[in-house]
Amino acid sequence: MKVLFLTIALSLFSILQAQDSSSSEEQFEGTYFVKAIVTDSEFFEKNKPKALSPLTVTHLSNGDLEAKFTTNMNGICEEIKMKFEKTDKPGIFSTNDGSRQVLIEKTSVRDHWILFCEGELHGMQVRIAKLLGPHTDENPKAFQEFKKFVSLKRFNEEKINIPRQTETCIPEHV
């Protein structure tokens, strides 16, 4: 259960860490769905979540991000909150004392983002890329841009996963 939790948390943390601090008109903030995900880590391949709940991202006044999502493991709903600290590099945030970094790239499709996470987990280097969007509807143009990004970062395109979307559960302690 801890491995599954870590898998989901790392997977979703990378979603949360991304806002370009440049003068972009759009901000990475609001509710997003993971539309596609790819990794080169066997650990994540074996433990990838089959369904993901929406992610709510809030831009904090100091430039950091806070993200919230829920996970339902063995019938128990839990809300996860994470804080991601901005770095001196535009578009890059860190977490876990800097052991993980996420780069965010805006696609040409409104409100669609590509997140690229690199870091260490259990002594292994892990790379994950995700396509996020505000709705569960497919967007072929955004997906094509994601595939191009995946290819440029030398991921195996055949390992792109389209996760099932699930509703946010309500934790008992709320």
UniProtKB/Swiss-Prot annotation:
UniProt cross-references to Pfam families, sorted A to Z: Lipocalin (PF00061)
One annotated Gene Ontology cellular component of this protein: extracellular space
Keywords: Disulfide bond, Milk protein, Secreted, Signal, Transport
Signal sequence range: 1-18
Tissue specificity note: Mammary gland specific. Secreted in milk.
Annotated family: Belongs to the calycin superfamily. Lipocalin family.
Physiological role: Probably serves a role in the transport of a small ligand released during the hydrolysis of milk fat.
Name of the protein this chain belongs to: Late lactation protein B
Record organism: Notamacropus eugenii
